[in-house]
Structures are given as C-alpha cells and as structure tokens.
C-alpha cells in the first residue's frame, strides 16, 4: 500500500525558502567572507549565527508538526490545561532554583556555557562559512558537538552572558518542546492501554513526567543534553505504531534526519539508537514473518540499508575516529562497576518507590496482551542499552537520559492499569498512592542537595551544592591575577570536590581573566595528559585536605617530594573558611633533567599503559631543555 502525496502548506514553503536563503548565504560567505553582513551583530551575537539558530528551531518545529499529524494525536481542552500547568510549574521551579543557588559551574557543568561563548566568537571572527564547518567538525571529532549550541544561540542572544542565564535560556527553550512531545507520547500510549478514565490518565502521566527527577538533573546543573531527548521522543512517536505495512517516504526521511540529529547531539545517544533500533527491527521483521507479509520485510530491509548508507556517508570521519580509539581503555577510569554495578546505580537513581511503580507496570504490562509487546520491548531496550553502554563506562545522571523513555513508559503502563479500575474507591486510593508518592519523591529531590537520599526516594538531588567559600575563591583568583603576567600560569593540583582548577576558572564568569592563567588541570588516567605545568608553571597550588580524583593525589605526592620541592618555595596560603587551606608554591629554579627524570620514574607504569599521554609530553619537555 503506497502513501498518498501530501499537499504543501505555508510552513513547508517557509522552511524551503529559509533553507535556500541559508544555503545561498553559506556559499557567498565561502567566496566573500568579509562582506559587512557576515560581521554584523545583534545584541553582540553574530547575525548569521542567529539566523542559523532560528532556522534550526524552525526545522525542528516543522518536524514536530509533521509527527503530530502522522500520529493523529489530538489534545482535549483538559489536556492542554494540564500541559500548560505542568510547564508553568517546571519553569517556576527552574527560575526559583537559579535565583536562590550559590553554585560554581565546573567541568561538564560549565562546558556547554564555554562552548556557547566560543561559538559566538568563532562565527564572528572566522565567518559564517568557517563557523558551520567548525560545527560539522565538532560533530565528527569531538565528544561534545556544537549542535546544541546552535539551537541555543538565538534564545541566548537577548540575555547577559552568565552561566545561570544560560541554564535559564536552555530550560525555556527545551522544556516546552520536550513536554509537548511527552504529552503526545502519553496520548499514543493511551491507545494501547485504553484506560477507562482518559483525562485522569493524561493528568497522571504528565504528573509522572514532570516529577521525574532524572529528566531535570543534568539541565539544572548546566548540561542541556536534554535537547537530544526531543529527538529521541520524536523517533519513538514515528516508530511506535509503524510496522512497514505501507510505504511512507516522509516518515523515512524524518527518521533518518532525527537519527543524524540524535547522534550529533551527544555521541552517547548512539547507545540508545543501537539498542532501540535492534529491538524495533527484530520486532517488525518477526511480526512480518509470522504474518507472512514479505513486502513489509522488504521495506524494513531497504529502509535499514538506506539509513546505514546515509549514516556511513554523513558520519564517516566520526566512524573512523571511533574505530581507531580504544574507549574501553581510555575511559576505564569511568567504568567503575560494569553492568551489574550499573543496575544497582539505576535502582538507586530511581529509588525503591519509583522502582516499585516500574516493576508493577512491568508485571501488569506483560499480563495484559495489549501491552505485552510494548512492555517486553521497553525491558529489553533498558537492559540492552545498559549492557552496551557499560562496555565502555558507567552512566552518570546525564547519560541516564537515554533510559528515561522506557522508564516513563513502564510507569505509564502501571498508572494505565490503575485507570482501568472500575471501583471508584480503588481508583481513588491507587491514584492517590502512586501520584502522591511521585509528588513527594519529586519534592524531596527538588529541595535537596545531599549526595545520598533515603532509599525510598530517587537518589537525584536537584539543588546543586551551595557554596560558602566564593569570596575565598575570589581572593585566590585576585592573587593569581596580581602575580601572573601575560603568558605565566598557576597550576592547581587538586582535581576533586570541592576544589579543582575549574572551580577557580569558572568562579567569575563571564569574566574569563583567570582562565588565561589557570589550566584546566589533569587527573584522569587514560583521558588526561601528564600535567607539564608541574614543570612549567610559575606557581603551583595544592590544598589540605587534598581533593582527589584518579591520579591527582599521586601527582600531589610527587610534587611534594624532595626533588621537585628543590625548585619551589612556598609564598602564600589561603584559609578557605571550611577546613581547607590552599598553599601556593613559586618556582625558583627552572626545570631540569633531574626533575623530568623524577616524574618519568614515578609515572613509569602509567606511561607504559598510555605512552601518548605521558612519554610524548616528557619528550617535548626534554626538547625544551635542549
């Protein structure tokens, strides 16, 4: 059965003309990069980058409108009110959280902010053509791509360039689209479950989604990886009820585009893509074989081949990088407990309460024939995703976003079973217990900054640790700025929490002055290079008690040993007011062969395992001596 051609609408033409306009600008910028248009700004933002960002959102909204039409989802008045209330509650909470926090974004929490500042400078300095090339290269070669920053460039144009406002703009940009798609997802799942109380099911589903802490942790801490979840839900909506029984070229196009966007958003979303499409492909082909619908098998295979070929062409440089890299070795510091340990971590992330809801949904879904396939699919998807992910590393809070759709589906199945109850007192009691606990769980997480929460609740504190030492950190920064001239650096050895180099670098953003003198630091075996600043920096800082991560304490012990200390003298110390004291050492003798040899001997084992991260650095230092 072939699809009927769809009539073009106004939105289609707007997208076509805007795409052509951007393509023309791209070509012209490659030929005439110095045209005034390519140097023009709006509120300090490069206008061509602003236009690219607007186009990206336009394209995404076009996809969403097409997916909504293809799924046939219709919202009732009560559905729209519930969605609006849910978004209002979320945005108010995000605003409150940002206005009341005393937090310094560091490491992955601040990386997207830095990239946002960087992409603006790069488009303005290098031009529109080279800016787009940089975005493409970041997708191919970097662990963090600039795709998310392209989407956020236009909204971020109109606010001061602070980390808190970056998080605020990310939330205001991403959450409405994401929860609109989650609302569509709830309506589609409703068709499978067929609850007797549809309005209650939708309101309960939105309550479960809004109060699910794992959705919010990454974004509240400065990581807008949530954008990729928009693409994930779009893929699910396009496939959940499609079995290749008819040809649908627009659906194929949208799926391929969304797969590309998902991969480009964050590389680890590929684990979800592999697990999901393996499960989906096996299910569709088995169904077709059992029903002897060979044309469905043919369409599935042809779509798979077309998708694979497209991805191979688009991501060829990335594929080469991935195949050449040994991530299981270089990321070994992040693989702390493997598959079994990750299952335990996921149980802790969820908490006993939500785990009980998910397990209840699993049992109910398997028992009921209408939801059996969907439930088994979700279970296999979760375990398969975790299994392949832990071949490389364990999952952090942001990585767990790829499990959110399956978790949410199983919770919806549980609540859908409740909404099929006929006795009103049973319906009222069960709904109150499930939604009441989820509300309490959300409140506990939303008001906590503790590292560990009671086991009945999700171990996902949504309030960042509140700092009381910001003035002390600024005092250290002022000292560094006063004592370091251009080209001089101060290396900070601690690399854990509460202190690491990035805490000092990020303290006064958007003022980047300290970052010019304080390097990012080095600690993670297999990922970070040997810190040559131990031998090159004018100042080296350490603290007591020490803040360790991976190799940081070994670097600290080595630095405080006799041979390196012959080259330094202590010149200052800072009481941080919380039991930590920082000591500043100034280099009084230049590095020599004895000092280099000491580090070579101390880290011989690490160099044997990762020569490109150690020996290569030492060889360069020896060349400098010569």
Predicted feature locations:
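Start-transfer (signal-anchor) and selected internal transmembrane alpha helices
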Residues: 1-95, 199-202, 298-307
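Transmembrane-helix motifs of polytopic, lipid-linked glycan transferases
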Residues: 66, 165-195, 234, 361-366
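Membrane-proximal lumenal/periplasmic loop motifs of glycosylation machinery
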Residues: 99-110, 123-150, 171, 345-349
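Transmembrane-lumen/periplasm boundary regions of multi-pass, lipid-linked membrane glycan transferases
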Residues: 112, 118-122, 273-283, 287-371, ...
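Loop-to-helix entry region of an early transmembrane alpha helix in multi-pass inner-membrane enzymes
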Residues: 142-180, 218, 222
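Short acidic/glycine- and proline-prone juxtamembrane loop motifs at membrane-interface regions
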Residues: 217-227, 396-397
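Membrane-proximal, lumen/periplasm-facing interface regions of secretory-pathway glyco-
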Residues: 432-482, 496-502
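C-terminal luminal/periplasmic domains and tails of membrane-associated envelope-modifying transferases
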Residues: 462-492, 497, 506-626
């Amino acid at each position: 059965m072939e699809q009927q051609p769809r009539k073009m609408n106004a939105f289609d033409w707007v997208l076509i003309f805007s795409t052509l306009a951007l393509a023309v600008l791209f070509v012209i910028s490659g030929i005439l990069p110095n045209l005034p248009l390519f140097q023009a700004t709006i509120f300090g933002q490069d206008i061509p980058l602003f236009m690219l960002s607007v186009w990206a959102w336009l394209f995404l909204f076009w996809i969403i409108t097409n997916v909504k039409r293809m799924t046939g989802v219709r919202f009732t008045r009560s559905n729209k009110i519930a969605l609006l209330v849910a978004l209002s509650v979320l945005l108010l909470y995000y605003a409150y959280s940002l206005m009341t926090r005393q937090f310094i974004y560091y490491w992955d929490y601040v990386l997207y902010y830095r990239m946002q500042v960087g992409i603006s400078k790069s488009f303005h300095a290098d031009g529109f053509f080279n800016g787009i090339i940089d975005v493409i290269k970041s997708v191919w070669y970097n662990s963090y791509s600039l795709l998310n920053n392209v989407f956020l460039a236009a909204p971020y144009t109109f606010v001061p360039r602070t980390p808190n406002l970056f998080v605020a703009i990310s939330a205001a940009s991403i959450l409405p689209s994401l929860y609109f798609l989650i609302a569509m997802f709830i309506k589609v799942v409703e068709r499978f479950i067929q609850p007797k109380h549809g309005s209650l099911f939708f309101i309960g589903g939105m309550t479960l989604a809004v109060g699910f802490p794992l959705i919010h942790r990454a974004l509240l801490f400065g990581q807008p990886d949530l954008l990729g979840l928009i693409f994930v839900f779009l893929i699910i909506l396009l496939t959940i009820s499609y079995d290749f029984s008819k040809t649908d070229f627009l659906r194929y196009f949208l799926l391929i585009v969304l797969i590309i966007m998902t991969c480009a958003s964050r590389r680890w979303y590929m684990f979800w893509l592999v697990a999901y499409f393996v499960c989906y492909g096996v299910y569709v082909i088995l169904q077709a074989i059992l029903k002897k619908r060979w044309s469905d098998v043919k369409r599935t295979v042809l779509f798979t081949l077309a998708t694979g070929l497209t991805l191979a062409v688009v991501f060829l440089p990335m594929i080469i990088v991935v195949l050449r890299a040994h991530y299981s070795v270089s990321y070994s510091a992040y693989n702390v407990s493997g598959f079994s340990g990750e299952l335990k971590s996921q149980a802790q992330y969820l908490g006993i309460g939500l785990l009980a809801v998910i397990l209840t949904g699993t049992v109910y879904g398997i028992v009921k024939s209408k939801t059996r396939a969907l439930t088994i699919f979700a279970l296999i998807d979760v375990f398969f995703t975790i299994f392949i992910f832990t071949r490389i590393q364990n999952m952090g809070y942001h990585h767990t976003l790829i499990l959110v759709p399956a978790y949410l589906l199983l919770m919806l199945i549980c609540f859908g079973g409740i909404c099929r109850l006929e006795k009103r007192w049973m319906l009222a009691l069960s709904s109150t217990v499930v939604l009441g606990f989820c509300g309490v769980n959300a409140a506990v997480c939303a008001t906590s900054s503790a590292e560990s929460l009671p086991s009945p609740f999700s171990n996902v504190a949504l309030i960042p640790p509140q700092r009381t030492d910001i003035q002390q950190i600024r005092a250290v920064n002022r000292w560094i700025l006063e004592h370091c001239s251009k080209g001089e650096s101060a290396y900070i050895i601690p690399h854990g929490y509460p202190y690491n180099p990035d805490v000092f670098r990020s303290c006064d953003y958007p003022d980047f002055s300290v970052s010019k003198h304080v390097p990012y630091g080095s600690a993670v075996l297999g990922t970070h290079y040997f810190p040559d600043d131990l031998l090159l920096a004018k100042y080296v800082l350490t603290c007591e008690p020490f803040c360790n991560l991976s190799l940081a304490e070994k670097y600290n012990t080595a630095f405080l040993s006799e041979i390196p200390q012959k080259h330094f003298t202590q010149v200052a110390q800072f009481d941080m007011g919380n039991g930590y004291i920082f000591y500043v050492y100034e280099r009084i003798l230049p590095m020599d062969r004895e000092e280099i040899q000491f580090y070579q001997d101390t880290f011989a084992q690490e160099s044997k395992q990762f020569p490109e991260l150690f020996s290569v650095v030492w060889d360069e230092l020896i060349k400098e001596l010569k």
